[in-house]
Amino acid sequence: MKWVDYAQPSTLDDALGLLKKHGDKAGLLAGGTDLLVLLRANAKLSDVIVDIKSVPELNQIKFDATSGLTIGASVPCHEIYNDSNVKKYYPGIIDSASIIGGTQIQGRASLGGNLCNSAPSADAVPGMIAMGVTCKIAGSQGYREVPVEEFCLA
């Protein structure tokens, strides 16, 4: 494993700035269940690891009766199936989160990571597609929303 820098931005703007600066040489860390394996195997060559777990909006679950449920990209799966609003209104999301790896993996893995990794074995993706889940994607030019199905095909 080669030496890499580590950055832990505390705002979404800072995280986006790092990702823009380093491009393909940045590794995005939410839970790390896939990224760390790739780094150890030298299958992903990164100059910097951008750890997004300290970005508040990426690490929270929000529910509003009008706008629905928002789950940040770095929320660990175990927090999803322990949330009372998710249990009450979105049990299918719990099903999707609970099939990602075993108990230890679920303490770190996230739906965002499962989706962004784009692995054929991404356990939660079929359920998210069936439920019509959308991704809110942040970039240097603002936000956009994309259905999970389109995100997976991009």
Question: Where are the predicted features?
Answer:
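C-terminal structural segment of proteins
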Residues: 1-154
